[in-house]
Amino acid sequence: IREAAEINRLCGEWNIDYSAYEGGIYSSEWFWAKALHVLREDEHVRAKAYSIVEYCEWLPALITGVTKSDDIVRSRCARGHKAMWHEQWGGLPSEEFLTTLDPLLAGFRSRLFEKTETADKPVGKLSPEWAERLGLTTEVVVAGGAFDCHMGAVGAGVTPHTFVWVIGTSTCDVMVATYEEIGHKLIKGICGQVDGSVIPGMVGLEAGQSGFGDIYAWFKRVLEFPLKEIVGKSDLLDEEMKERLVTEACNRIIPALTAEAEKIP
């Protein structure tokens, strides 16, 4: 959270607002905030770190046999939405911006990348090792990486003027727009508007809630606490009855609350 606050403050003071295409506000869950937090907190990682990679870039690189950081194909989706990458300012935020944010970031920009690719472009073919492990052939083409909700929108058949809601541990609201329609508009408060992050040749827009299913799971555990800790340890019932009662009650909590909530005018 501290790192994100520092990034937002510096974006507001700098001659270029690098958060402009990310809704005008940078999240603590995103690339630079996470990387800086790790560099500050972990001396061992700080001493050894050469570059920084997103998981959706690392996995395609791994299974295609890429072993050098410089050869990893970088994701337009990941970098545009989370790393403040944009062609308008030549890719990533400037070295001066990053080192002003924290000198610990010095040198990383030159060891990262300038270019990103959309997910429709193959990154290579399965390496012999992974072809054997997966029971496939080395002719299998591996697509570029992107975030799960963006690819969920592709799978749902997203088109302009449709809205795809991807619900899970978080909720992601995804749309696409033509260049002509979005023009020079900058939409405040969303998680980014990125050329080609969903469908190449269109601007992908993402919004949503970073916590959704996780919060429901936490809430359910809070409500279950007296059942498991009091009923589950009661001496008034035998073990089988306690287990059945606790399981039934836990399974009915959220549906029962939902039914009551639906009655509220």
Give the residues covered by each predicted segment:
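Short hydrophobic-aromatic micro-motifs
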Residues: 26-27, 165, 173, 203-207
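Short glycine-aspartate micro-motif
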Residues: 52, 139-146, 155, 162-166, ...
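Conserved phosphate-binding catalytic cores of ATP/NTP-utilizing and phosphoryl-transfer enzymes
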Residues: 9, 127-136, 146-162
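Glycine/Thr-rich phosphate-binding loops that ligate phosphate moieties of nucleotide
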Residues: 1-13, 43-47, 65-69, 83, ...
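Short, well-structured active-site flanking segments
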Residues: 166-167, 247
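Short beta-strand scaffold segments in enzyme catalytic cores
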Residues: 82, 151-155, 171-175
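Gly/Ser/Thr-rich active-site cleft segment
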Residues: 14-144
